[in-house]
């Protein structure tokens, strides 16, 4: 774990928040009331996601330290129909990322833990983003794109693409699946869109613990 955040935010603060999340799952998350309706959720995947469930158990020992709050999937769950919009406001689903291991993160500008976590996610994408892995950070602010774009610019987040869902449908769909309780929420998915593990609350995603978890998921 570096002692200085690449984008100027103090590591100690993230460490403290992540530690709380590890002790009480989701305790550091900002809880939000469900509004609107969800979009595509989990699909029945009895055979398709067997490998993801096996992988989840295999890398469970790597969910420690700064990522101790990551909980392995206890059932086969395919999330390829979960939908949101890209930077051009065109609809995409998690199926669009087939072939890549994905770290899906939901965040909002009004969520303080999210704001503190974003530079770490940016650093992870900058360091490990490839044709095999991508951080997909989906902003769920209601309204237009002005606030999230301004926040990313002001904080120097330059490696994460802006994905959006101003209906909060993506959050609601994950909430109905029992995966999201507040913000931030982060899911690790395999290259077929099957759930490996999930976390409610922030983490130091630029830490060595986080990188080791991602490498384990990718198979490096």
Residues covered by each model-derived region:
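N-terminal targeting signals for export/organelle localization
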Residues: 1-78, 220
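A short beta-strand-turn-helix
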Residues: 71-76, 81-102
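Extracytoplasmic
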Residues: 77-79, 97-99, 130, 143, ...
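Conserved redox-active cysteine motifs that mediate thiol-disulfide chemistry
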Residues: 98, 106-123
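Alpha/beta-hydrolase fold active-site loops
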Residues: 101-102, 133, 184
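Conserved hydrophobic packing residues within short motifs/helices of P-loop NTPase cores
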Residues: 104, 136-138, 187
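Structural microenvironment flanking redox-active thiols in thiol-disulfide oxidoreductases
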Residues: 115-156, 166-174, 212
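Thiol/disulfide oxidoreductase modules built on the thioredoxin-like
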Residues: 150, 154-159, 165-217
């Amino acid at each position: 774990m570096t002692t200085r955040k690449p984008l100027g935010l103090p590591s100690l603060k993230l460490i403290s928040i992540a530690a709380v999340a590890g002790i009480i799952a989701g305790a550091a998350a900002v809880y939000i009331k469900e509004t609107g309706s969800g979009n595509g959720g989990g699909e029945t995947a009895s055979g398709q996601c067997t490998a993801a469930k096996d992988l989840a158990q295999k890398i469970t020992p790597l969910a420690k330290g700064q990522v101790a709050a990551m909980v392995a999937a206890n059932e086969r769950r395919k999330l390829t129909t979960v939908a949101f919009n890209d930077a051009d406001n065109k609809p995409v689903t998690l199926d669009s990322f087939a072939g890549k291991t994905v770290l899906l993160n939901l965040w909002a500008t009004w969520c303080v833990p999210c704001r503190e976590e974003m530079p770490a996610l940016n650093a992870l994408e900058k360091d490990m983003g490839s044709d095999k892995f991508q951080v997909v950070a989906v902003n769920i602010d209601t309204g237009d794109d002005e606030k999230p774009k301004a926040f990313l610019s002001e904080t120097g987040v330059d490696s994460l693409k802006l994905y959006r869902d101003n209906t909060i449908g993506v959050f609601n769909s994950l909430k109905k699946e029992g995966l999201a309780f507040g913000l931030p929420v982060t899911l690790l998915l395999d290259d077929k869109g099957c759930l490996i593990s999930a976390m409610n609350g922030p983490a130091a995603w630029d830490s060595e613990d986080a990188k080791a978890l991602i490498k384990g998921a990718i198979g490096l």
